[in-house]
UniProtKB/Swiss-Prot annotation:
Domain of life: Eukaryota
Name the UniProt record assigns to this protein: Hsp90 co-chaperone Cdc37
Gene: cdc37
Keyword field contains Cytoplasm: yes
Subunit structure: Forms a complex with Hsp90.
Lineage: Eukaryota, Metazoa, Chordata, Craniata, Vertebrata
The UniProt record lists the keyword Metal-binding: no
Predominant place of localization: cytoplasm
Length: 377
């Protein structure tokens, strides 16, 4: 089975300021991975049932063959037939036990299926293969610009209420608040809550993130339920709360599984954003360090021979002159040029007066500085 493609999250940008505009947010795509995960679990459950049924049928086929063979051997009185009969009867006994095991597992699976909690994919079934009803035609999908404008306008108007809803804990409180503020039951609220979760995780406010994540899943369930029933979300949110408040432990566990999976995705997205921000910061710092020749002094320093690194560590020019003298001239010139281009070594004013000097001038300069004291002696 192919893995879920989570790349739909890549376009969600975590704001680092007070800008409430988050362009190009597509809630159906954003939550599609949750729906896909649930569908895959349902498919896995169905496949398990099919495998159990196939196993039971295969076991029964082998048992029927063994029983037939036992009847045939029972008619024969030959010595060899008696030995084979004993062996076949043992096999028959083994297959009967396996049949009971397969049947028990299949019965448990079927019982588990009946206890499975409802979701937006199983809540409603087709009652008729065809219906003739006058329905409102689907409106044209909003453009990206329209989505951005709609989201920005909504957040500007309801940001305070959305944040309040995100901090609620009890089912009754959430239902009551949505009853008082039905306009919050929409995709724009879900958009804001998701981004709010990622922002909080980036800021390392983990407890708050988990609280808002809970309310995000609540809103997601309501929106998916409305989509399945083809009704306005504002008209079915009470139905969700009635179910969740009276659900058995298994249904509550299913809700919690959805919540935990969502929080893991939030942590993953936050980690990616933090790593991206760190890389951008490191690149900015690197650009600030670049020398006149466009090289990074840190990278150049790390590429130098240990003996040259020691010269720069101790800021000892005499030591550097000695090291340069002992090195191969070509290698020394190359190292000194990189040192200048990165700003590790700053030539004297004489060297800056002419741009036409060769790259080896720096090497000659260091060498000359070493020879001049010797001449004076």
């Amino acid at each position: 089975m192919s893995r879920i493609d989570y790349s739909v999250w890549d376009h969600i940008e975590v704001s680092d300021d007070e800008d409430v505009s988050h362009p190009n947010i597509d809630t159906p795509s954003l939550f599609r991975w949750r729906h896909q995960a649930r569908v895959e679990r349902m498919e896995d459950f169905k496949k398990k049932g099919d495998d159990l049924n196939k196993g039971l049928q295969e076991c029964r086929r082998k048992l029927a063959e063994a029983q037939k063979k036992v009847r045939e051997l029972s008619i024969s009185a030959a010595g060899d037939a008696k030995a084979e009969l004993t062996k076949t009867q043992t096999e028959e006994k083994k297959l009967k036990k396996e049949e009971r095991d397969w049947a028990r597992k299949l019965e448990e699976h079927n019982h588990e299926e009946k206890k499975m909690p409802w979701n937006v994919d199983t809540l409603s079934k087709d009652g008729f293969s065809k219906s003739i009803v006058n329905v409102k035609a689907d409106s044209a999908e909003d453009t990206e610009e329209e989505k951005e404008k709609k989201h920005k306008t909504f957040v500007e108007r309801y940001e305070k209420q959305i944040k309040h809803f995100g901090m609620l804990h009890r089912w009754d409180d959430s239902q009551r608040y949505l009853s008082d503020n039905p306009d919050l039951v929409c995709e724009e609220t879900a958009n804001y809550l998701v981004i709010m979760c990622i922002d909080l995780e980036v800021e390392e406010k983990h407890a708050l993130m988990e609280q808002v994540a809970h309310q995000t899943i609540v809103m997601q369930f309501i929106l998916e339920l409305a989509k399945s029933l083809k009704v306005d979300p504002r008209g079915c949110f009470r139905q969700f709360f009635e179910k969740i408040k009276t659900a058995d432990q298994q249904y509550q566990d299913a809700f919690n599984d959805e919540l935990e999976s969502f929080k893991e995705r939030v942590r993953g997205r936050a980690k990616i954003r933090i790593e991206k921000a760190m890389k951008e910061y490191e690149e900015e710092e690197r650009q600030k360090r670049l020398g006149p020749g466009g090289l990074d002094p840190v990278e150049v320093y790390e590429s130098l021979p240990p003996e040259m690194q020691k010269c720069f560590d101790e800021k000892d020019i005499q030591m550097l002159q000695d090291v340069i003298t002992k090195m191969d001239p070509t290698e020394a010139k190359a190292h000194m040029k990189r040192c200048i281009d990165s700003g590790l070594w700053v030539p004297n004013s004489k060297m800056d007066e002419s741009d036409e000097k060769e790259d080896g001038s720096t090497y000659e300069e260091v060498k000359q500085e070493q020879e001049e004291p010797a001449k004076k002696e």
